[in-house]
Every structure is written in structure tokens, then in C-alpha cells.
């Protein structure tokens, strides 16, 4: 049975989308499996609301993470965990008995500068940048992008990347509050301060990494806090230069899925080149006694996302 997620950015025509009764293929073991969670944003403050009036459960989100860690620790075949960004505390992740790979989000950068954040999260970045890659099996490569490479947050005042981002926002967003998309139309709504861009050096690295994966006949999963597709995400959550990133990705056949956080509602799409896009439902927006986390089983021909509660199951078959 195929289901669509109402207002969650899922395109009902995407027949390779979501199922309620998701099951592993009979007789096949995954090549590897990994846990996923995004946008925990725990804080010891009263519940609040987003810019759009969506409830946020700041104190409860830590319980979502605790239940996720407990579930992952008991999963015999889980290989690692990916946190898709926006955490304010790290100690719960330290209870994981599997390796945890972190992506940085805007709320991470609001709380700590990069020079403190990256060592704390054990991100193997260079020159303060948080992009890297690893290969959990010979058949696959995971590529992690730093969506706040060019950003008005996280870098020191006066840093060239900060100045470049502020200059860019001044041209693109006429509002005095650069976090507001008011008056911006369509895809231009992404030009807000809580988003960012992938810089030139990182784009060249991505291109080289995908070239190498192609030579090795590896499939690639690209991960970034910020989404790259406006069907799988609200327009105002998109990476500023998502089009440049996707232009590189679409030059190769190796990238099978782009996974992200930031959007909070969650969403799914398949683009015109057959690349799957999945933005994950936020732990922050789980009312008490509900959850949003999951794990992904990776096969040679598909990804199967098994979600807890508000995290929707997703079946992602590859075209080739």
C-alpha cells in the first residue's frame, strides 16, 4: 500500500514513496544499516512555536533522542548513527554504542563557534569546514556536506565567509530582519539568514568525490542539514545554492539519495534524474509521548527507512 503524507511535501504521484507496512526484501540482508534523527533542539525552556505557528516541544525533544539511542543500541545489526543537525546538547549521543556522525545545522552554530563545535562533535573538518565522506561498505559512500560553509552564522564577525554571506543576503533579501522571507516569492524564499551555501572549494571537492565514486562503481548517499529539493522541503528551508549542488550531482549516476533535516515537517520526492530526496521529521515537533527517529537499511537496489511514530516509513528504489 502506497501512502502520501498530506502536507509534508510528499508528491502523491511518487509511486516509489511511502508505505505503512514496510518490509525487508525476503532472503536479503542489508549491506549496512544506520540510525537517523534530526532537529532535536532540546532546551530547558517552555514550549513555543515556529515562525509559522507550529508547536515546538523543547523539553520533550530530549526524551525522543533518549528513546532513539535506546532503540539503536538494542538493534543488533545497526552499524552507525547520523545526526542530521541542530542539537544543543551532545551528552545523550555519547551513550550510543555505535559511532555517531554529526552534521552541523544553524542551531548548532547559534550556540558554539565552529572552532569549538567541530572538535566537540568529532567532525573531521579542515579549516573549520564540516564536510567529509566515509565508506561503510565497498559498495557505498556517504558524503556529508557543510551547508553553512558560506553563512552569516558560525564564523567570526569580519570573517570573509561571513562578509560574503551578508553581502549576498543584502542583494537577495530586502527585509531589515534577514531571517524573514516576507515579500520573497517562490524559490527566493530560501534567501534568509538561517540558511547558507556550499562554497566553491567544497563544490570542487564534491565533484572530485563523485568522480572517484564513479570509478569505483560505488553508490553515493549525500547528507546535508539543508535540503536540495523544493518538493521534499519548504522553499524557505533550501540551501541557497542547491541548484549548483544538484548540477554536480546530476552529472553522475552514482548519487542515489539526498538526505536532510531543517524542514521539520519532513518530505519526500524523486527528481527528474531519479535521485531520491528525503527531509526528516523533526524531533523538536513531537508532542509528549510521540517520536521521530528511525533507521535505514541499505541494499544494492534500494534504501528502506523504518520510522518511529511521526517519522514516516519510506521505500526508495533505484532506477538503475
What positions do the PLM features span?
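Histidine-centered catalytic micro-motifs
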Residues: 222-228, 256-266
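Extended active-site neighborhood of metal-dependent phosphoesterases/phosphodiesterases
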Residues: 3-26, 51-55, 89-216, 241-254, ...
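Short, solvent-exposed loop/turn segments at secondary-structure junctions
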Residues: 44, 229-232, 238, 267
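Short acidic, glycine-rich surface-loop motifs adjacent to enzyme active sites
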Residues: 211-231
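A general structural motif
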Residues: 31, 78, 97, 217-219, ...
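N-terminal active-site segment of His-dependent metallophosphoesterases
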Residues: 2-88
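Active-site glycine-centered loops adjacent to acidic/histidine catalytic or metal-binding residues
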Residues: 39, 85-86, 105-106, 225, ...
Amino acid at each position: 500500500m502506497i501512502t502520501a503524507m498530506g502536507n509534508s511535501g510528499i508528491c502523491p504521484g511518487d509511486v516509489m514513496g511511502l508505505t505503512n507496512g514496510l518490509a525487508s526484501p525476503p532472503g536479503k540482508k542489508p549491506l549496512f544499516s544506520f540510525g537517523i534523527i534530526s532537529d532535536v533542539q532540546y532546551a530547558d525552556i517552555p514550549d513555543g512555536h515556529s515562525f509559522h505557528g507550529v508547536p515546538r516541544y523543547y523539553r520533550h525533544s530530549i526524551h525522543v533522542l533518549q528513546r532513539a539511542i535506546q532503540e539503536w543500541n538494542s538493534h543488533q545489526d545497526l552499524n552507525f548513527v547520523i545526526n542530521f543537525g541542530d542539537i544543543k546538547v551532545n551528552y545523550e549521543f555519547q551513550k550510543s554504542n555505535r559511532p555517531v556522525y554529526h552534521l552541523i545545522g544553524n542551531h548548532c552554530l547559534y550556540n558554539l563557534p565552529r572552532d569549538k563545535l567541530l572538535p566537540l562533535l568529532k567532525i573531521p573538518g579542515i579549516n573549520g569546514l564540516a564536510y567529509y565522506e566515509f565508506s561503510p561498505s565497498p559498495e557505498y559512500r556517504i558524503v556529508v556536506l557543510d551547508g553553512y560553509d558560506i553563512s552569516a552564522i558560525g564564523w567570526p564577525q569580519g570573517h570573509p565567509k561571513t562578509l560574503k554571506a551578508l553581502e549576498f543576503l543584502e542583494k537577495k533579501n530586502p527585509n531589515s530582519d534577514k531571517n524573514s522571507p516576507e515579500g520573497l516569492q517562490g524559490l527566493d524564499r530560501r534567501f534568509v539568514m538561517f540558511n547558507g551555501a556550499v562554497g566553491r572549494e567544497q563544490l570542487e571537492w564534491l565533484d572530485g568525490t563523485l568522480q572517484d565514486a564513479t570509478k569505483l562503481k560505488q553508490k553515493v548517499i549525500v547528507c546535508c542539514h539543508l535540503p536540495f529539493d523544493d518538493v521534499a522541503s519548504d522553499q524557505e528551508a533550501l540551501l541557497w545554492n542547491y541548484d549548483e549542488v544538484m548540477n554536480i550531482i546530476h552529472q553522475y549516476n552514482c548519487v542515489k539519495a539526498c538526505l536532510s533535516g531543517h524542514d521539520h515537517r519532513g518530505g519526500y520526492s524523486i527528481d527528474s534524474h531519479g535521485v531520491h530526496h528525503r527531509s526528516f521529521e523533526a524531533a523538536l515537533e513531537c508532542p509528549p509521548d510521540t517520536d521521530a527517529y528511525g533507521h535505514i537499511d541499505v541494499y544494492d537496489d534500494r534504501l528502506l527507512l523504518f520510522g518511529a511514530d511521526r517519522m514516516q516509513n519510506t521505500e526508495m528504489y533505484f532506477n538503475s
